[in-house]
Amino acid sequence: MKGIGDPWGYAEPSVKRIHRKLFRLTDKIAALEVELCQVTAELEYHRSINDDAQRDAAVGNYIDREEAGATSADVRRFEKTISDLNGRIEKLSGKRDRLLASIPE
């Protein structure tokens, strides 16, 4: 039921609930995007270290090859984290889009 000073129906409990969910989803998406930005920057750092380690391993001894394996594993771990974060962001964005479509007009 619309209130006297509420021409858009925001007093409806279902609309309030949808709006609260939308705000929470938007906050979660924003936090994940910040985390994604940080992880991407770290990945670039680890890729640089990995490039150096791979070059050292090509001309170095067994210790250099072990370090190259470790840095390569770090790069793969960060790439997986980025992939997971992108998947979570896409999932939450889809959920947000469905909620936006369900808002009564």
Predicted stretch roles:
Residues 1-28, 103-105:
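Short, charge-rich amphipathic alpha-helices with coiled-coil/heptad character
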Residues 24, 31, 56-59, 77:
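General structural signal for alpha-helix termini and helix-helix connectors
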Residues 29-36, 74-99:
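Amphipathic alpha-helical coiled-coil segments
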Residues 9-10, 35-37:
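A short linear-motif detector with a strong N-terminal bias
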